[in-house]
């Protein structure tokens, strides 16, 4: 497309980014939240990407390098194109730009979670992405079961935990790094409290209230030797912090941890990837 430029964003692009996301959920369409969100992402080393035509921002994406226990990849957190410019190859060019960055950074693949409600999995298939692991989701009421092992409350989980331990719960985004950032490096104005426990064996559990429901928390959990009682430990922590429900997002391989609960486990998403 004539006049199209894909480039790294700056804080000065926030007004254009807001226009791209107008009418969508999330912080980018909000004039109060967009600037601190973009500033924090840039500070934390995300590749905040924009597409522009004749100096007008018409697309926005955010990528983050993730080096977890299974390898190194570049994760696409969000991508949005203005309605009037969709279907013109702009998204594909933004993806290709991200793939070039992934190669330059030594990442073995790029990964994302397509929004199945919008049919974006078809777009990624056309870009050469393959379907990976299934992500499932379940919400369970909190209860005072008691703890199955000794825990200590600490200020935060260290970033290096994503390289040392498997990411058991918390996959509302298929990147341990991105979810760690959301819970531990919040932008200015995000006053949600993250509670962190570490066990005697080095397992980490984090609870943080959801953006739109302060009585419901999502959980992040890292472990190399998952405790069969993890779920009850997490629900016990949730009850002690005043939450009514805990949201668990996880790869299907961990579904057995919920065999003692009657809540329906739902399909959430499919991890999608492309080797670089």
Predicted segments, located by residue:
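Conserved beta-strand in the GNAT
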Residues: 50, 56-65, 73-75, 80, ...
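Charged, low-complexity intrinsically disordered regulatory/assembly segments
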Residues: 189-276
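Conserved catalytic-core motifs of GNAT/GCN5-like acyltransferases
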Residues: 111-113, 130-144, 263-275
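Conserved active-site tyrosine of GNAT-family acetyltransferases
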Residues: 123-125, 129, 256-261
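Conserved acetyl-CoA-binding loop-helix of GNAT-fold acetyltransferases
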Residues: 81, 87-100, 125-126, 226-239
